[in-house]
Amino acid sequence: MKFGIVARRDKEAALKLAYRVYDFLKVSGYEVYVDTDTYKYLPEFHEEDVLPLEDFDVDFIIVIGGDGTILRVEHKTKKEIPLLGINMGTLGFLTEVEPHEAFFALSKLIEGDYHIDERIKLRTYLNGENVVPDALNEVAILTGIPGKIIHLRYYIDEGLADEIRADGLIVSTPTGSTGYAMSAGGPFVDPRLDVIVIAPLAPIALSSRPMIVPSYTKIDVRNLAVTREIILAIDGQFYTYLEPETEITIRLSPRKTKFVRFTNEVYPKYTMKIKRKF
């Protein structure tokens, strides 16, 4: 069994726990690799065990950090490697255990006492080409000039859904429904559902409301303000400016994100975290 370890780089406690996990797994006889960025911030790992995250070819990745760290890992890994998240962030919607549970969780993982939770992702096409990362949380189409609204028209399976003047449009998975989409007025969606949330961001018209559509839906977005650039943001990890005439299409990705889970609990785990968030 082979493991990869990635830690939140700006938190000393996360880096120290990463080394303890690394040492525990090495002493237990497993192959263990550490990503290059973690090594830069804590160069105590054996150099021969250091690899770029993109080159990880392991059975599991232990992610020690918050949701942002998990999203960074998910964007950089090329394979669908199951992730075990140890929470060193604020709320940790995507993580599975707290730091004091880390070694108990590792023991259960080694013993095979776990299950895999698969989450859908979204794929974005720009003028018909997929040149940007898949989204685990959301695809956000945002105004390129703060304080200036954008004029968007979006279609669902070729049919006109709405035309909005707003700060942007968020297209979210159930996983991302507790993030940016919820701040835009979207609902909490049970992560076991295969649906997509579409949420206008601060629209002028109060009739432009969030909606939920099936995951197999094709969503096309057009920028009607032909002189104004827009920003495409994916999971808060990837950003790019788009020319005004860019045709944006969002569909279900063939890839999924896999998480190691030790229980099937959804409630009250998520609802309590939402209460703490707001």
Curated annotation (Swiss-Prot):
Cofactor(s) in the UniProt record: a divalent metal cation
Catalytic residues (UniProt): 67 (proton acceptor)
Enzyme class: transferase
InterPro entries: ATP-NAD_kinase_N, ATP-NAD_kinase_PpnK-typ_C, NAD/diacylglycerol_kinase_sf, NADK
Keyword Ribonucleoprotein assigned: no
Compartment(s) where it occurs, according to its Swiss-Prot or TrEMBL record: Cytoplasm
Catalysis performed (reactions): NAD(+) + ATP = ADP + NADP(+) + H(+)
Sequence positions that bind NAD(+): 67-68, 72, 137-138, 148, 165, 167, 178-183, 202, 237
GO cellular component: cytoplasm
E.C. code: 2.7.1.23
GO biological process: NAD metabolic process; NADP biosynthetic process
Top-level division of the source organism's lineage: Archaea
GO molecular function: ATP binding; metal ion binding; NAD+ kinase activity
Function noted in UniProt: Involved in the regulation of the intracellular balance of NAD and NADP, and is a key enzyme in the biosynthesis of NADP. Catalyzes specifically the phosphorylation on 2'-hydroxyl of the adenosine moiety of NAD to yield NADP.
Protein family per UniProt: Belongs to the NAD kinase family.
Protein name per the record: NAD kinase
Source organism of the structure: Thermococcus onnurineus (strain NA1)
Upper taxonomic lineage: Archaea, Methanobacteriati, Methanobacteriota, Thermococci, Thermococcales
